[in-house]
Amino acid sequence: MTQQRRILITSALPYINGVKHLGNLAGSMLPADVYARVMRLQGHDVTYICATDEHGTPAELAAQATGQSVQAYCDEQYEVQRKAGEGFNLSFDWFGRTSRPANHTLTQHLAQQLEKNGLIEVRTSKQVYAVDDGRFLPDRYVEGTCPHCGYEKARGDQCDNCGRLLDPVDLINPYSAVSGSRNIEIRDTDHLYLLQTGMQDRIRDWVNAKGKNWPSLAVSIANKWLDEGLIARSISRDLSWGVKVTDADGNPRPGFENKVFYVWFDAPIGYISATQEWAEATGNDWEKLWLTDKGADQTEYVQFMGKDNVAFHTVSFPVTLLGSGEPWKTVDKLKAFNWVTWYGGKFSTSQKRGVFMDQALSLLPSDYWRWYLISNAPEGSDAAFTWEGFQAAVNSDLANVLGNFINRITKYCASKFEGKIPETGTSGDAEAWMANELAERLPRLIEFYEAMEFRKAAAETRAIWAAGNEYLTKAEPWVKYKNDVDGAAVGVRAGINLAAIFGIIAQPIIPDAAKKILDALGIPEENRKMPAGSKPEDFAALLDAIPRGHAISPPDVLFQKIEDSQVEEWTAQFGGGKE
């Protein structure tokens, strides 16, 4: 067993405005879950934290559209997202909320620390004001034409088309997202500004040191922001919903009574506050995960996110933590993902493009989706979701390579050996070949997971399953049984042990199917850790690990094949196939 490590994992906080689509899932929460499961299966001390991101203009706009208060809307949507996460077997140790008191308190505290250290100041700025609405229009409350690419539905904080961050006053032909009014003025308003410029060199040094453990995508995005030069950014907004701006005594700050902190200032702080919620609810210690003078220097902190969140996590959030002057833990390893594309565009919550988590679960169980999204993870480049690709992955990898192997070997053991691990026979060339395959492939599988290369890990998992099928072709227990029962016994014994190995290594990606396999084989919980070894004989022993004479039972069919008619139906239902 490797030395136990303490690992903190966070995935980008899903925004509260509705069920997340499969692109959101594939770009943060799902790979973080797979990584958490792998680390737990190796005996490490893992804490996987996530939360709903509940502040900002989209929450207010969505609540208005439903006729609810923002609080009621967020309460309802939190439950929707929590249940969707459970449906996909996301193994959060805690799924918190940024609207809870812990996040308000910590956000206000960190802002005070930053101001004490000269990194926050009040500035008067020009902001969009809707005369007919009688209010300022921050962020997504204003829409218009992007000044960079000409996209006509750009929002005040970011253009969905080119991805550039925007200031509402930059939009061409702006209009109110609330009323549609174009009776717009530019007026002065006071806001808090985070003076990132003063942290430029420190953040550059930090990125250079930490970026060695990041994929090139994340490093390039961070360096792009740094190369362009960090600027002072407004961290307050003219909104009513959010973390209130307070003074050093915790009272409303004069002149800021109707303002809150910008959502991108408080949201990543939610990683810490959600961990505090977890600690309070479970009796655990949050400080050893987040404060380097309380043990967090011995914690590995791993973040997962889509590429659109990288700049905030590699620049803005580190400015907050490092600039506070307090011993906060910053990220060690960062995994950034590209987009999952949907027939010519990207998945989009606002435009209702693609398949959403609740819709997916109404079609098929979560393992089907988990396998396809991880085996097709958007790592080196964007990855296309297609119904045909989904069908091929399920039918080939899950139904054929894994499912048929489990079905064949367990049913044969039940019919010819009374459902018990055979006790006779001596291993031969086929078993030696299979042991060599395991000796080569199992360590490589762990290496891929350690490197957070999920497509390669899924491919290696499948390759191990495929090697097991090739082993059965070499061993031919059903042929040998006629004249050499002992020879057949060796093949069945090794085959059942392979089925257990296949179930164990499947646990991170397809946990439900893995549990069905391991339960049917009667594998105790304590024997479901990831297989490890250092010598050839360690891997040979895996083919004879289950006690001889142990009773097993064939599981039900693990995966149903996806029929062409289903692909046609789903294509029509969700609009796939239309470029």
Curated annotation (Swiss-Prot):
Keywords: Aminoacyl-tRNA synthetase, ATP-binding, Cytoplasm, Ligase, Metal-binding, Nucleotide-binding, Protein biosynthesis, Zinc
Binding of ATP, residues: T349
Residue span of motif 'KMSKS' region: 346-350
GO cellular component, as recorded: aminoacyl-tRNA synthetase multienzyme complex; cytosol
Keyword Zinc: yes
One GO MF term attached to the UniProt entry: metal ion binding
Superkingdom to which the source organism belongs: Bacteria
Cofactor notes: Binds 1 zinc ion per subunit.
Pfam families: Anticodon_3, tRNA-synt_1g
GO biological process terms held by the UniProt record: methionyl-tRNA aminoacylation
Reaction equation(s) it catalyzes: tRNA(Met) + L-methionine + ATP = L-methionyl-tRNA(Met) + AMP + diphosphate
Locations listed in the record: Cytoplasm
NCBIfam families: metG (TIGR00398)
Subunit structure: Monomer.
Annotated family: Belongs to the class-I aminoacyl-tRNA synthetase family. MetG type 1 subfamily.
Protein name: Methionine--tRNA ligase
Gene that this polypeptide is encoded by: metG
